[in-house]
From Swiss-Prot:
Organism for this UniProt entry: Leptospira biflexa serovar Patoc (strain Patoc 1 / ATCC 23582 / Paris)
Any one biological process term the GO annotation gives: translation
Protein name as annotated: Large ribosomal subunit protein uL24
Residues forming coiled coils: none
NCBIfam families for this protein: rplX_bact
PROSITE patterns named in the record: RIBOSOMAL_L24
Gene3D superfamilies membership: 2.30.30.30
HAMAP family (alphabetical): Ribosomal_uL24_B (MF_01326_B)
Protein purpose: One of two assembly initiator proteins, it binds directly to the 5'-end of the 23S rRNA, where it nucleates assembly of the 50S subunit.
Assembly description: Part of the 50S ribosomal subunit.
InterPro entries: KOW, Rib_uL2_dom2, Ribosomal_uL24, Ribosomal_uL24_CS, Ribosomal_uL24_KOW, Translation_prot_SH3-like_sf
Family per similarity comment: Belongs to the universal ribosomal protein uL24 family.
Keyword annotations from UniProtKB, A to Z: Ribonucleoprotein, Ribosomal protein, RNA-binding, rRNA-binding
Length: 127
């Protein structure tokens, strides 16, 4: 008796090492929210998604409860795929020339004193 395997789309990646962490300042580089900056509220490593403060907000309708007796619509942040955001380095943007603004930088890992730390690439400055 052969069992039929169902295709469930892209399987979630477990225990993936992400370069974006909570409380980082990031810039959205693609999608309908392109160009917006915000602070990372949470990282969902299982689904490769990030929640960013003030970005990708949607309305949800809630029933009246004791905490919210009126009920109604509330706006909450929805996740964005981690490939659509880049780390934003405010220090580098302030030092840049006015014509050439540095919006986002790539992150990498480097060994310092036996520990793995996040650094900007290609400069190698520790974050």
């Amino acid at each position: 008796m052969a069992t039929k395997l169902a295709y469930r789309g892209s399987e979630p990646t477990k225990f993936k090492k992400t370069k974006i962490k909570k409380d980082d300042e990031v810039l959205v580089i693609s999608g309908k929210e392109k160009g917006k900056k915000g602070k990372v509220l949470a990282v969902d490593k299982r689904k490769d998604r990030v929640y960013i403060e003030g970005v990708n907000k949607r309305k949800r309708f809630v029933r009246p409860t004791q905490e919210n007796p009126g009920g109604g619509a509330i706006e909450i942040e929805f996740p964005i795929h981690i490939s659509n955001v880049m780390f934003h380095d405010a220090k580098a943007e302030n030092k840049a020339k006015p014509k050439k603004k540095i919006k986002a930088v790539r992150l990498g890992f480097a060994k310092k004193d036996g520990k793995s730390v996040r650094v900007t690439r290609p400069e190698g400055k520790e974050v």
